[in-house]
Amino acid sequence: ILNDWKTETNGVRTAGWFQQFDLPNQNVKVFFVPVRHWSRRGLFDMNKRLWGGYVIQSDTATIYFGGDSGYGRHYKEVGELFTKIDYFLIGIGAYEPRWFMEANHNSPGDAIKAFQDSGAKTMVPMHFGRFNLSDEPPNEPLRALLEEAGELSLTDKIKVLTINESLEIK
């Protein structure tokens, strides 16, 4: 992922989509999974590195970190491979204007479709409300998400964390 920063001691590893990593001395597996975005760290390295999300599996829970992504079939593919996702962390902000942001950032409606595609039990929205990154007001993504979730009777499946709040997963 950060190949140029890789050293023998910093633990950075390169990964391909769906590659699995086992954490030493723990019953935890980490899978690097596809998202729809782009990458750039310098002037001449556009899309030279792979972008992605993660599925983290333990004996007690499976977490799907959807990364920074636009809507796509990858959500359904991940849900088909990992059939018991407990928590799906997905971006809901930085989506306006759609003509520019749609390929790389989910709208709240896209996030709900992705949640349904993934088959996860609980959605944890992220990537909203802290920084003004695009044209929608900072509070709009959560408002729109909860409105649409209410229309689809999904409100009880969404766990909203406040800024700096954590969620203990056992």
Residue spans of the language-model regions?
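Residue-level detector of functional hotspots within protein domains
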Residues: 7, 40-42, 55, 109, ...
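Cap/insert and terminal regions of metallo-dependent hydrolase folds
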Residues: 1-4, 62, 69-162
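Helix-loop-beta element that forms the nucleotide-linked donor phosphate-binding surface
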Residues: 2-16
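Conserved beta-strand segments of alpha/beta enzyme cores
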Residues: 10-13, 29, 122, 157-159
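Core dinuclear metal-dependent hydrolase active-site scaffold
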Residues: 14-83, 163-170
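Short low-complexity, flexible loop/linker segments enriched in glycine and/or proline
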Residues: 8, 29, 138-140
